């Protein structure tokens, strides 16, 4: 039985996982790489670190499984979205560090674009809003701030890509410059209705079309790896951005199904089907996947700080040594205290979209200690998810206007404390699957589908298995009181920004 190898290139580490044909995991490898913070609100990665860690983990996973290139039917790639690399087309060398999705350096540019009235047009075409989060203004910044970059781009000497595109270029030895529709849909340059790069958007951001990759289906033959990498070529047959890949790995194929992934940030996607639904509550309209030339759309809510709030407890405050300690510590908190953390460390994402505000704690007393801070950090993830859930309920008219169950995955989904509190605040069941490597599984599925290893989507969905269902156990009065307190905390933070303005 052949393997399918999934490359899961994330914000803090690169992983490779070998899946068997029955979707069980044969082997995996992971390698972290450095983060760079050259200025307040700036986040960068070295593109060579991303490539080196990806190649190393692929080789390590193959070695653990005793697999050769001949044993692998296909490679699937999933990646941190929106992160931008620009490189020299001839040498393959990046002209600057990658600008990461969390980076906020283009906030002033985005503010000016909004003031100039461009947002309605951009939202209509892309399903997105004007925000530093997305790739377009990052590319423009590189062209304007790296000496000679704009002239080189206009001469056709530079290539642009999200991380999937960069890895595909390196895997194929510089032979293939392509991406898939899910990654393209996150750039602020792609028209999600026509399925092509948009000339009006390219002109607005002054990005030459010659820089841009070909856009393909999420499940397709993108190219073959260079012979010298693995001892023989391996076909690369699937690509999707990490959140779309997780949606596929969670078998969310029917309209109304929703998943939420908890990694560095939190990202909820609700499948809306073949027709894009325009949000009236500051959610994003995005492409969930594209198969056989047909696009399936989703509503998405993006939260910038989820697991990184726990990292802050560990690395910033030093009150825990391991993330697994957070839930037991939160259990010890004083129930008489109502401490709220609004973790706007890099601004607020959906549904507020304010890149200027910064994090704040509300409700602290003289007795507030580590347990209360741990409690507030974990609850902040649940409150932010509630905000997305409420917005989705308001926007989605199918399935009685409310997704009945939330499927969860990612590192924080392993925290029973957090998942139970999430069910309590949503007043809805929260389902955690047996296979929690859903992002990698989604990438593997796309590749395996193209290679003929995995079945069509609905048959694949039959393989989804429940590990645990968390049911709401909080009284309505307590839920309403806690949500009202969160609402006041967010309102207070946003008011402080207005006061400074």
From Swiss-Prot:
Positions bound to ATP: 11-13, 264, 307, 311, 411
Superkingdom: Bacteria
Xref: NCBIfam families: glycerol_kin, PRK00047.1
Residues binding glycerol: 81-82, 133, 242-243
Name assigned to this protein: Glycerol kinase
Enzyme nomenclature, EC number: 2.7.1.30
GO cellular component entries: cytosol
CDD domains linked to this entry: FGGY_EcGK_like
Entry GO MF terms: ATP binding; glycerol kinase activity
GO BP annotation list: glycerol catabolic process; glycerol metabolic process; glycerol-3-phosphate metabolic process
Residues binding ADP, per UniProt: 11, 15, 264, 307, 411
Residues where sn-glycerol 3-phosphate binds: 11, 81-82, 133, 242
Cited InterPro entries: ATPase_NBD, Carb_kinase_FGGY, Carb_kinase_FGGY_CS, FGGY_C, FGGY_N, Glycerol_kin
């Amino acid at each position: 039985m052949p393997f399918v190898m999934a490359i899961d290139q994330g914000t803090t580490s690169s992983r490779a996982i070998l899946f068997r044909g029955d979707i069980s995991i044969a082997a995996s490898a992971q390698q972290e790489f450095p983060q760079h913070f050259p200025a307040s609100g700036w986040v960068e990665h070295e593109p060579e670190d991303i490539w080196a860690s990806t190649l190393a983990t692929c080789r390590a996973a193959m070695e653990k499984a005793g697999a050769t290139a001949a044993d692998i039917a296909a490679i699937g790639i999933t990646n941190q979205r929106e992160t931008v690399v620009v490189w020299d087309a001839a040498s393959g060398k990046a002209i600057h560090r990658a600008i990461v999705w969390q980076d906020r350096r283009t906030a002033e540019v985005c503010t000016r674009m909004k003031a100039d009235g461009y947002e309605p047009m951009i939202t209509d075409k892309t399903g997105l809003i004007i925000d530093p989060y997305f790739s377009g203004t990052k590319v423009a910044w590189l062209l304007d701030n790296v000496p000679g970059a704009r002239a080189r781009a206009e001469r056709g000497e530079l290539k642009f890509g999200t991380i999937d595109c960069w890895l595909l270029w390196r895997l194929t030895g510089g032979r293939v410059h392509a991406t898939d529709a899910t990654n393209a849909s996150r750039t602020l340059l792609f028209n999600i209705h026509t399925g092509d790069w948009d000339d009006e958007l390219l002109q607005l951001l002054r990005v030459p079309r010659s820089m841009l990759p070909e856009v393909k289906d999420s499940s397709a033959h993108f190219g073959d790896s260079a012979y010298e990498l693995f001892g023989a070529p391996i076909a690369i047959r699937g690509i999707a951005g990490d959140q779309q890949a997780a949606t596929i790995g969670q078998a969310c194929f029917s309209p109304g199904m929703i998943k939420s992934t908890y990694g560095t940030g939190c990202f909820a996607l609700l499948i809306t089907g073949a027709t894009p639904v325009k949000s009236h509550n500051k959610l994003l309209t995005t492409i969930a996947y594209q198969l056989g030339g047909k696009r399936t759309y989703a509503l998405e809510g993006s939260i910038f700080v989820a697991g990184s709030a726990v990292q802050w407890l560990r690395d910033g405050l030093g009150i825990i040594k391991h993330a697994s300690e957070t839930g037991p510590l939160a259990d010890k908190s004083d129930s008489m205290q109502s401490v709220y953390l609004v973790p706007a460390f890099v601004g607020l994402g959906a549904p507020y979209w304010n890149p200027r505000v910064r994090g704040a704690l509300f409700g602290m007393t003289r007795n507030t200690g580590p347990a209360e801070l741990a409690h507030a950090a974990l609850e902040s993830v649940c409150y932010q998810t509630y905000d997305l859930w409420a917005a989705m309920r308001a926007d989605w008219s199918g399935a009685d206007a409310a997704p009945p169950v939330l499927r969860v995955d990612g590192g924080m989904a392993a925290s029973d404390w957090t998942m139970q509190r999430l069910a309590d605040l949503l007043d809805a069941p929260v389902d955690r699957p047996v296979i929690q490597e859903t992002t990698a599984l989604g990438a593997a599925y796309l590749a395996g589908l193209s290679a003929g290893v995995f079945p069509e989507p609905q048959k694949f969905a039959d393989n989804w298995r429940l590990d645990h269902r968390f049911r709401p156990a909080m009284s309505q009065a307590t839920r309403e009181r806690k949500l009202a307190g969160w609402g006041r905390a967010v309102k207070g933070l946003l008011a402080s920004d207005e006061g400074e303005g």
